[in-house]
Amino acid sequence: MPDKAGRKMQVAIVGSGNISTDLLYKLLRSEWLEPRWMIGIDPQSEGLARARTLGLETSHEGVDWLLARDELPDMVFEATSAYVHRDAAPRYAEAGIRAIDLTPAAVGPGVIPPANLREHLDAPNVNLVTCGGQATIPMVHAVSRVVGVPYAEIVASVSSASAGPGTRANIDEFTKTTSKGVETIGGARRGKAIIILNPADPPMIMRDTIFCAIPEDADQDAITASIKEVVAQVQTYVPGYRLLNEPQFDPPSVNSGGQALVTTFVEVEGAGDYLPPYAGNLDIMTAAATKVGEEIAAKLAGASLSASSGGRS
């Protein structure tokens, strides 16, 4: 739907790689957002070529070209690298352009839609944390809103084939940013994140394991219900997100530091818009980015999309 003036938000995609191209296909379906520009640095980029055939203005001259236009976007989606976004973010802010950051730069607040999106709809720059964070932090949030979680650990296993040079170059930032998100967004007092690049061929879809320490007398039924509710919320924008089985509860043991545990297993199958379905780790980022952009546009138009955009009470 358009804004109060009857106009969709005009958006630019900065970056022309696989993630940006997949994001483009999602944005083209949006009732709230209209992709107008795609910016890259490689004139031979397949992403730029596809964008041109779909009617977008494109350039391989980077952010300088975009910001020199007579008409500027209302919003940019940046899928480059952390250091590139850190340089560009102040320029977007100076130009009055909202930014949705798909890199680990974390210039703005981290956003996981079911957990805290409503808190940050007015922020000029929001960060999508990481693919592992988008897949696992909702589950930590689901537990922590029922009981205290002194410690949470997530293990994200993704196909090696889906991990491009950007992902590999950002492994350290992935673990730091995801661990911080487990704490500040997920609600765990202490968090840890591990990523595994699975070399299996044919490629395996993204699978994640989420361990949460909980009190021994925690209400297991309430925790299970909360987990399933949040899974359903994620599925509104990532249909391929699902529980592999029921949450597993274990009593305190030496191995768990004397604490009870709930373990959740999820998998993420991509929609196959541009990326293959096994690349759920990338698809969940582009889907979450689209969700965040649409919610921002809806708020500016005085509307509300759904109840799946979390906010802590």
From Swiss-Prot:
Transmembrane segments: none annotated. Keywords: Aromatic hydrocarbons catabolism, NAD, Oxidoreductase. The keyword Oxidoreductase applies. NAD(+) binds at residues 16-19, 162-170, 281. It comes from the Bacteria. One of its GO terms (biological process) is catabolic process. One of its GO terms (molecular function) is NAD binding. The active site is at residue 131. SUPFAM superfamilies: Glyceraldehyde-3-phosphate dehydrogenase-like, C-terminal domain (SSF55347), NAD(P)-binding Rossmann-fold domains (SSF51735). The keyword DNA-binding does not apply. InterPro entries: Acetaldehyde_dehydrogenase (IPR003361), Acetylaldehyde_DH_C (IPR015426), NAD(P)-bd_dom_sf (IPR036291), Semialdehyde_DH_NAD-bd (IPR000534). It catalyses: acetaldehyde + NAD(+) + CoA = acetyl-CoA + NADH + H(+). Its EC number is 1.2.1.10. Belongs to the acetaldehyde dehydrogenase family. This is Acetaldehyde dehydrogenase 1. It comes from Mycobacterium sp. (strain JLS). The lineage of its organism: Bacteria, Bacillati, Actinomycetota, Actinomycetes, Mycobacteriales.
